[in-house]
Amino acid sequence: MPKVIVGNLEFASIEDYLAALEAWEEARAPFKAQAEVLADEFVDYLREQGLSKGTISKHGKNIEMFIVYLTQYTDADDLATVRKGVVNTEFFRWYRRKVLDRCDPASLESTTRKFFKFLAEKKGIYNEKVLGKRGK
């Protein structure tokens, strides 16, 4: 029976791969659910700020893709400890490869920065790696 190789992982069969994938998705489910709720609350927060529908839509789509990236393509399990490189460089590279959209990296950076500021100000989730030390 042929082996299944994914990245640097090797599985004896497709069944083993699918079982491992299912277990991984199950383990990630709580973080994914939390991140999706926070993304929805972020969009509500943007509405409360009086931003235009177009701006809200763009930030909403960007943060939705960021959550997909975090929950499906990284091992992140806490928004307070996500590295700045994951938020900026790695997410931007992934976005360019996976999303058929000519999004400006500055737009993605603006969205993720607003999202992490929202988390800090409204949810008490402060990510020093992304926002820097408090008071700076």
List the predicted regions and their residue ranges.
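A conserved mid-domain beta-alpha-beta active-site/ligand-binding segment of alpha/beta enzyme cores
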Residues: 33
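N-terminal core-binding DNA-recognition domain of tyrosine recombinases/integrases
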Residues: 3, 22-29, 40-136
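Helix-loop junctions and short alpha-helical segments
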Residues: 4-17
